[in-house]
A protein has these predicted regions:
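Short acidic-glycine-tyrosine-enriched beta hairpin
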Residues: 56, 86-103
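Short histidine-centered beta-strand/loop micro-motifs
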Residues: 62-67, 84, 109-111, 133
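A short, N-terminal "cap"/entry segment at the start of jelly-roll beta-barrel domains
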Residues: 3-50, 83, 99, 129-135
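Mature N-terminal segment immediately following signal peptide/propeptide cleavage
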Residues: 42-64, 73
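Short, conserved beta-strand element in jelly-roll/cupin
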Residues: 55, 67-82
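Extracellular/periplasmic catalytic domains that process cell-envelope and extracellular macromolecules
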Residues: 46, 66-67, 74, 91, ...
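Histidine-centered metal-chelating micro-motifs
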Residues: 61-63, 81, 98, 102-109
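Ligand-binding loop in jelly-roll beta-barrel domains
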Residues: 89, 104-127
Length: 135
């Protein structure tokens, strides 16, 4: 009986690790990797919180886009340049933060020589796409 339980535990563990790995890999495109860490309803009706870890390889950029709500960025490592509509470009390093108002067009680029990462927290309208690309 103990052997069956151990086998079951091993299979479940392998499936979960495989699912996480596939999910993480599926979110990598053009040198930018995105892993959604959590998504929860909040006390404001029709809104939710989404948190993601985003990696940028050196020289990669995520072009103009916006979100259906506020974004708070915390730089985990590296140097990221943010261009926010109506403001001068700003370069943030590890430990620095940036607030982006709802619907504001912005872009991000890794301007350093190594990988850069950010923790992005969004308070957005539930049911709407998290990112809208702007041409």
């Amino acid at each position: 009986m103990k052997t069956k339980k151990n086998l079951f535990t091993a299979i479940v563990t392998i499936v979960l690790i495989g699912t996480y790995t596939i999910s993480a890999c599926a979110q990598t495109k053009n040198g930018i990797g995105r892993i959604e860490l959590q998504r929860h309803d909040i006390s404001t009706l029709g809104r939710e919180m989404v948190q993601a870890h985003i990696d940028f390889e050196p020289g990669t950029a995520f072009g103009n886009h916006n979100h259906p709500g506020e974004e708070i960025i915390y730089v985990l490592e590296g140097e990221l340049e943010y261009i926010v509509e109506g403001k001068s470009p700003v370069v943030l390093k590890k430990g620095e933060v940036l607030f982006i108002p709802a619907g504001t067009i912005h872009s991000a680029k890794n301007v350093g020589n190594s990988k850069a990462s950010e923790l992005a927290t969004y308070i957005v309208e539930k049911g709407k796409p998290l990112v809208q690309l702007i041409k």
